[in-house]
Amino acid sequence: MNHTARKRQGWQRSVSQKLAGAVVQGIACMGASAPLLLMPAWATAAAQAQADFDIPAGPLAPALAHFGQSAHILLSYPTALTEGRSTSGLAGRFDIDQGLAILLAGTGLEASRGANASYSLQASASTGALELSAVSISGKAPGSTTEGTGLYTTYSSSSSTRLNLTPRETPQSLTVMTRQRLDDQRLTNLTDALEATPGITVVRDGLGSESDSYWSRGFAIQNYEVDGVPTSTRLDNYSQSMAMFDRVEIVRGATGLISGMGNPSATINLIRKRPTAEAQASITGEAGNWDRYGTGFDVSGPLTETGNIRGRFVADYKTEKAWIDRYNQQSQLMYGITEFDLSEDTLLTVGFSYLRSDIDSPLRSGLPTRFSTGERTNLKRSLNAAPDWSYNDHEQTSFFTSIEQQLGNGWSGKIELTHAENKFDELFNFAMGELNPDGSGLSQLPVRFSGTPRQDNLDLYATGPFSLFGREHELITGMTLSQYRENTPSWGGWRYDYAGSPAGAIDNLFNWDGKSAKPAFVESGKSSIDEDQYAAYLTSRFSVTDDLSLILGSRLINWKRDTSDRPYGGEETEVNREENGVFIPYAGVGYDLDDTWSLYASYTKIFNPQGAWVTDESNKPLDPMEGVGYELGIKGTHLNGKLNSSLAVFKLEQDNLAIWQHDNVYSAEQDTTSKGIELELNGELAEGWQASAGYSYSVTTDADDQRINTNLPRNSFKTFTSYRLHGPLDKITIGGGVNWQSKVGADLHTFSQGSYAVTNLMARYDINQHLSASVNLNNVFDREYYSQSGLYGVYGTPRNVMTSFKYSF
């Protein structure tokens, strides 16, 4: 019985055993399960649905009156309480508690809920509970959650410095892929989301073979976070399902202040969905060409009458083929989270996620772009060099728990523990050789990988305001402890003997059906990676004047990595690397020109150890990458925060950039420089009109001022917009966008790909207040292009359509 048949027969058993087991154990430990979300607490909890608000900045009293009328609540307070106080306004879709928190931010007042939809206002003994600038817990700060706002931007983010800042206050380039944007474009995984993100280049070295890489400002992205907690690249973040996340925050430039080491490219922060105070649920379904089908549900709300326990459960299932022959994928997500209000000041959160993906015949490293005679191949996009016995199976599991405490006087603290593991088993096949015009010349080169890397993190910090020289400032300090362990079997490496055998030959690629003898792999040894990182950081935002702010921070890191390779019957090879007392400074400054525009500048150090596999001719690890990063820019906030704009210029200087030479050998490039410009606009242009547009120019050069990394575009432009029609057509939303990039190529003189643009469209119809139907048409003009180009290339996704529905209740 082949691997495919075993997987199909075992799928149901796996779901009933492993997935159900994870759900039962995970939710049991939380004291909740999906059915509990249907408890009568929904009916008994005093709840108000979310509403749209558009309250301008100004005096507080009329703003509160406007809010009370829009939210249909009774808000009582002494008149003297609001005298002389003002608000920054409120724009977007929020529930009552969220709206009041944002409206009252910085006023020193707080609202408390009474009976029969009544609220009272009083002076806050601990203003930090409501002040936007003083809260930075779990992405829960008022204005940070994007679900339900309908916007293509957010009101606040803490991904850059962990201080809760508005996009305008953040002294680095920031893009937030909001829940509305993810839904409108049907961006279902991280690769989809980043392909739509300005300033990010996605290089696909295959399809379904864990070979996607993400690049920003000329360098590969290596910093990933989930809810602000760093996670290893070996946990295959690229395959994360967007169904469990509220948004994706991308900070371009080095963020070593809070995220691992100081990688110069970008940091990707995935923010999980949280339980909602009000009951809500939705069911989705989708169908598209290439036999792509999916369904999911998302249920959230209070689990008790008082609402002091809240839960959320998300499930998503997809089965899909693709435009290449024999490819087939099944994936399943289960995510649960519960919040417990242990007191008015203490919040306990526990949760889990489980993602399984089984892929048949994944394409690895693409197909030749030139024949042996030198002409371009122009192969059919449906060709696949993967045999029917190849596969790529993953099971990703994560458990997390945290406790958050309001400490008084605007201070709060958080401790979070996470455990994540990624069980994988991969049997890939590479097409090797020179392709002849008659389809002959290629051989198969199979390889197998398997293992279960694990990572444990402890993250703790405290944040709050302090007074100095008569002004109030903000501070955050914390520690991160990370332990990564990977012990994997060795399967004998690349099967060159198989490539040279009759069973390994591909007689004619043009009509090959993927049939060949499956190679036998015998475990031949063990390898391991043990990596520990301990870091402490301190950051403060000083309010120098009403218009001038200064952010100063530093991070102190101890890092150690031990790797070993133990072949059975051979000599063990060990490589040990350690860095202690690494100091990473950070500085940022912002100056408000007026109520709309701000100038900013930032500086940070770059320090990043090389990957465990990056060694020189002597099998010695390369020295860590080191350098500095500079960024200058101007940012604007428009329409009461519904629209954000930015212009940035940057320069990165780096030594010891790893350049591949041959096999597993790298050299260290010195004096590399990356510089460029980024422009971006995100948010609401007018009522019902959302837009995102971004242009990026980036070029990386060596010590001789020669361009390197030419497989990355020098120029790129990405845009997407959606518009809800008015009048009798107000149930219809239409949208579309274009992704364009300039010429690229591994060698621009012998092989290159010219500039190209991919156009995408969408439409949604609200059948009634509960049910909506959508259609997405991608690559409308069926543009043929390589998503990775060189001697081997991988075609980008051809024209495709996806229809979907969503029922909310």
From Swiss-Prot:
A GO molecular function held by the record: siderophore uptake transmembrane transporter activity
Keyword Glycosyltransferase tagged: no
Keyword field contains Transmembrane: yes
Cellular compartment(s): Cell outer membrane
Signal peptide residue numbers: 1-45
Domain TBDR beta-barrel: 278-809
Motif (TonB C-terminal box): 792-809
Induction details: By iron limitation in addition to the presence of one of the two cognate pseudobactins BN7 or BN8.
Topology of the protein relative to the lipid bilayer: Multi-pass membrane protein
GO CC term (a single one): cell outer membrane
Major site of localization recorded for this protein: membrane
Domain TBDR plug: 166-273
Xref: Pfam families: Plug (PF07715), STN (PF07660), TonB_dep_Rec_b-barrel (PF00593)
UniProt KW keywords: Cell outer membrane, Ion transport, Iron, Iron transport, Membrane, Receptor, Signal, TonB box, Transmembrane, Transmembrane beta strand, Transport
InterPro entries: Plug_dom (IPR012910), Plug_dom_sf (IPR037066), Secretin/TonB_short_N (IPR011662), TonB-dep_rcpt-like (IPR039426), TonB-dep_rcpt_b-brl (IPR000531), TonB_rcpt_b-brl_sf (IPR036942), TonB_rcpt_CS (IPR010917), TonB_sidphr_rcpt (IPR010105)
Role of this protein: Specific receptor for the siderophores ferric pyoverdines (pseudobactins) BN8 and BN7, iron chelating molecules that allow the organism to extract iron from the environment, especially under iron-restricted conditions.
Recorded family membership: Belongs to the TonB-dependent receptor family.
Protein's recorded name: Ferric-pyoverdine BN7/BN8 receptor
Gene designation per UniProt: pupB
